[in-house]
């Protein structure tokens, strides 16, 4: 993962990385808003402050960047081992992955439906991501209707 950036350039790049209102979040939020869905963003009342929360349906959505959330970790990790500061990055991303699992378990335990999208999927297939969300809403409504009929 060698690059041609100086330490100062690398530092500046890293400082410019946002943790909320990222491009991938904005793209997905705009698509949901245009379909009439209203949501909370970075909802602090829930574990992990999910990027998008559809409180009406008890759905949380995380928009995960590939690097920081360790997509294809079995490929990325060996590449990171060759990089400067490899111990830091491997530890950081490993912990992010663990935290993602912990938060997801906690949210599921609290009765929330958790959806995760990779950033590139949001950017390349926004409509498909929205469709996944809409299908999840449909499934939840069907479950709700089924429970009402049983009672």
Briefly describe each language-model feature range:
Residues 1-116, 120-151:
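Nucleic-acid endo/exonuclease domains
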């Amino acid at each position: 993962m060698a690059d041609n950036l100086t330490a100062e350039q690398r530092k500046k790049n890293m400082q410019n990385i946002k943790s909320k209102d990222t491009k991938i979040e904005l793209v997905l939020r705009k698509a949901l808003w245009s379909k009439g869905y209203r949501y909370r963003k970075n909802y602090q009342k829930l574990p992990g402050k999910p990027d998008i929360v559809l409180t009406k349906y008890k759905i949380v959505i995380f928009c995960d960047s590939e690097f920081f959330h360790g997509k294809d970790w079995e490929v990325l990790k060996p590449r990171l081992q060759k990089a400067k500061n490899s111990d830091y990055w491997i530890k950081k991303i490993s912990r992010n992955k663990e935290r993602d699992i912990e938060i997801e378990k906690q949210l599921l335990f609290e009765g929330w439906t958790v959806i995760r999208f990779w950033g590139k999927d949001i950017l390349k297939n926004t409509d498909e991501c929205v469709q996944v969300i809409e299908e999840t809403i449909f499934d939840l409504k069907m479950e709700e209707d089924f429970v009402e009929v049983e009672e």
